[in-house]
Design a protein with these regions (language model features):
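Single conserved hydrophobic/aromatic residue that forms the stacking wall/gate
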Residues: 273-277, 281-291
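Conserved alpha/beta enzyme-core scaffold
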Residues: 1-276
């Protein structure tokens, strides 16, 4: 475990601007970007602004919101600047794949940390987003842990955007200052997935069939697709449900607040909503939302 002595001095010495941090990235390197709503937007924007200075840069990401349109840059630069490798198939754009602009590494999310940690897919750089450090130098990956912890532990160079808007989330989400090479302080709103205000007829019909199959006491894994979200909305008459999933949505939290989700009959991690996936091989990541 890293020592917390003098961590503040180390933190200040490692603080740089986004431009200076991205200048540490070299052509031909493999760069991991924090996943989903945990994407370090300020760092990604700085990366895109320097894209024409790179050659053969490979961007690795699990699930991206792509606010800086990295795919558009990959398309525009005809493969000379950067390529994007996705581990989550749902984030892929088929035209980009057809033109060899984007690549897919299909695998279970739970296997990805081992891929990084064993260096089967070595990462040269990890761009992540964290909360400010606590009194002992520990920072939280907050709302998006998934495979980011393994990426941060295995990358040759770790650059962290420190955002006061990132909440400290309990569980295996903490990274010490000593594990990070450079810090970029920048406050900005976190990304979010807007809820679908209206659902089409097909997802609603699918959900109506699924909800009849879900019994009281069932443990659920919830996706982000329309049918899954419609199913969650139809579970208000179910009791003692459990959650063991990659994502935590507003509708899931509404069920928890109403008492439909108790996690008492899961058989594993009782009383806990289990969110995300292993951050290292054979070690579950837990976020205890219930007492």
């Amino acid at each position: 475990m890293p020592t917390s002595q003098y961590w503040a001095d180390s933190y200040l010495q490692k603080m740089v601007s986004a431009d200076d941090a991205i200048a540490k990235v070299r052509s031909g390197q493999r760069v991991f970007i924090g996943s989903g709503c945990g994407e370090p937007q300020h760092l990604v924007q700085a990366l895109t602004e320097r894209a024409n200075r790179f050659s053969g840069l490979e961007i690795v990401r699990l699930l991206g919101r792509e606010t800086a349109s990295l795919t558009a840059i990959a398309d525009r630069t005809e493969d000379t600047s950067l390529n994007i490798r996705s581990i989550y198939l749902g984030s892929a754009k088929s035209p980009s794949i057809a033109r060899h602009k984007r690549f897919i590494t299909p695998m279970n999310m739970s296997d990805v940390p081992s891929l990084f940690l064993t260096r089967k897919m070595p990462l040269n750089v990890a761009l992540i987003q964290v909360s400010p450090p606590d009194d002992f130098g520990w920072m939280s990956l907050g709302i998006s842990v998934d495979v980011t912890m393994a990426a941060a532990r295995s990358a040759d160079l770790v650059i962290a955007q420190v955002n006061p808007m990132m909440p400290r989330v309990m569980g295996q989400s903490f990274l010490h200052v000593n594990y990070v090479d450079f810090f970029v302080e920048h406050e900005e709103d976190l990304l979010f997935v807007p809820p679908k205000q209206t659902l089409s007829e097909a997802p609603s019909q699918i959900a109506s069939h699924i909800t009849h199959l879900i019994e009281d006491g069932s443990t659920l894994q919830i996706g982000l697709d329309a049918a899954s979200q419609a199913t969650v909305k139809g579970l208000s008459d179910k009791n003692d449900l459990g959650i063991h999933s990659q994502f935590l949505t507003d509708d899931i939290m509404h069920l928890y607040a109403r008492g439909n989700i108790t996690n008492q009959k899961k058989g594993y991690n009782l009383s806990l909503i289990h969110i995300s996936e292993p951050t290292r091989p054979n070690a579950p990541s837990r976020m205890p939302y219930s007492a």
